[in-house]
């Protein structure tokens, strides 16, 4: 079992790094965990739609280069399916039962994910209709993956 969190951009703030580190440690009891960061594309403040697409395409190429062919790709998207914590655990368990053991959760940059990445996705997951900073989403995601493993194992975890 391997969980990869693949994200555009680097974590800069110490408090986000500490939170991620804590959940990496907790999650390692259940799965191999890897966090891969790809560089975000430098972009001016006010971009045209064409420039935004170019940025998304370049970031998308970097993301796709890190995904193995056999990986189950779960993209975080505003338009994705919203699940409860139990629902995420059930979805992961269902996929594991089918023999899927290499999960890659993909978090896009500030402009979102390119169509090429969305096409590679096996499952579109949404945490909210709201937009969150990608640094925060990494922490929320890794905590929810950890919680999913606790639920799958029937272990107690605070609510």
Swiss-Prot record:
**Subunit structure of this chain's protein:** Homodimer.
Q: State the species of origin.
A: Staphylococcus haemolyticus (strain JCSC1435)
| Gene name for this UniProt entry | rlmH
Write out the GO cellular component annotations.
Answer: cytoplasm
* Enzyme Commission number(s) from the entry: 2.1.1.177
SUPFAM superfamilies, sorted: alpha/beta knot
Record's keyword terms, sorted: Cytoplasm, Methyltransferase, rRNA processing, S-adenosyl-L-methionine, Transferase
Which residues does S-adenosyl-L-methionine bind? Answer: 76, 108, 127-132
Q: Which InterPro entries match?
A: Alpha/beta_knot_MTases, RlmH-like, tRNA_m1G_MTases_N
Q: What is this protein called?
A: Ribosomal RNA large subunit methyltransferase H
Please give the family membership noted in the entry.
Belongs to the RNA methyltransferase RlmH family.
Which GO molecular-function terms appear in the entry?
Answer: rRNA (pseudouridine-N3-)-methyltransferase activity
- Note one Pfam family from the annotation: SPOUT_MTase
What does the UniProt function comment say about this protein?
Answer: Specifically methylates the pseudouridine at position 1915 (m3Psi1915) in 23S rRNA.
Query: Where does the record say this protein resides?
Result: Cytoplasm
Q: What class of enzyme is it?
A: transferase
Q: Which reaction does it catalyse?
A: pseudouridine(1915) in 23S rRNA + S-adenosyl-L-methionine = N(3)-methylpseudouridine(1915) in 23S rRNA + S-adenosyl-L-homocysteine + H(+)
